Amino acid sequence: MAAIGLFSSCVNDTYDTPKFDCVNPGLTKTKEVAALYTSAPTNGTTVIYPAPTKDPVTGKEIFDYIEAYVISSDEGGNFYKSMYFQPTDGSKGFNLSVDISNAYAQNFQPGKKVFLKLNNLAYANPTSFGRGLIFGAPPTEQYAVDRIPTLEYPKYLIPSCDIVSEDAIVHKITLAQALSGANYLNTLVEIDDVQFTDEAAGGTYDSNRTDEYDSSIFITDGAKTLTIRTSRFANFAGHKVPTGKGKIRGVLTRYNSTYQIIMRTERDVNMPNPRVDYTPAIIGTNSTVFPGTVNETFESYSSLPSQTNFPNYINDAAVGSKYWWVKTFSSNKYIEMTSHNSGGANNAYLFVPVNMTTANNLSFKTNMGYWNGAVLNVYYVLAS
């Protein structure tokens, strides 16, 4: 690795930020990122920024620049040849498609202020797949905005000698703000007072593979959930997900309609506090009554919204966060439990109290949608 010579040869688990000799490039921004958001096409097409003009007196080329702070890092392997930057005013950030490896060790660590030369770059503001302003090389058959080649990017991406602490530029927001995060798109965010969902906690970051490249697990504040996207190539992909509660930091991106946080390294998670049970058993007010007969059709319950509180029963999301809930199909009401879109395993119990000294027969109807195994079990629990 190019960074090996930057660290002490003795064994030490604390790593310093790489030190670089720096010559100030003496550049000044000429354009605002917000203005380029407005001018960039959103219909899937790409614009090539105009070539530089020439000073009529000196004949020197006149270039246009934007300035921003680096907020992504490929140190953890979760960003691959894609860098994110946040304008110095903290507004919506942008993505640069660039053929670079180990950028964090090449003077592009988070907090570094850089200049991006715009002339002859392609740019767009797609509203599907990866969302937000993106810059790169002109279109190819494979990409609408291609990667800037390795030998070319130093002409466009120019580091300054200025670097700030992440704490000076991070947006400390709530989970709800992240989910409606148009103002924070492609910026560095930190969300406190959250924990990984029951399905994710204790598993690995790569436990819920959504495709051959990425996994999606979720954090929650007890009311809402937010996607945490991890590449299978991240060096922490197989590490255990924390089971506590605390904060998480990363780049807030959007894929189609889904806002998601992409961590830079495992250090972006700090959850030392005790975990909260956000899905306790829902105990019905009459659940201690043991009738001699039970005839339940679920027709008396609400399906819009779907009811999970049953006065005569106990509904317990024992593993994961999914309860039994009331659904309707073809004017027929029933209860359903599914792990779909939960990000992990679920196990929910519906406790039905009944006096079996007078009742000696039990029957019910079932229907399995998207069958993938024998997942329904019936247990007798004796209570005295």
Language-model features, listed with the residues they occupy:
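Extracellular glycan-recognition surfaces and repeat-rich motifs
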Residues: 297-336
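Predominantly extracellular/luminal cell-surface or secreted proteins
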Residues: 86-88, 379-384
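OB-fold nucleic-acid-binding modules
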Residues: 11-80, 84-286
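Solvent-exposed strand-to-loop "edge" motifs in beta-rich extracellular domains
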Residues: 71, 119-121, 299-303, 353-357, ...
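Extended extracellular/luminal ectodomain segments enriched in beta-structured repeat modules
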Residues: 63-64, 343-347, 354-363, 373
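Exposed beta-strand and adjacent loop surfaces of beta-rich binding modules
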Residues: 80-82, 216, 361, 373-377
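Beta-strand-rich interaction surfaces with strong enrichment in secreted/lumenal proteins
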Residues: 103-105, 235-239, 337-339, 349-354
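C-terminal motif of bacterial Sec signal peptides marking the signal peptidase cleavage site
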Residues: 6-9
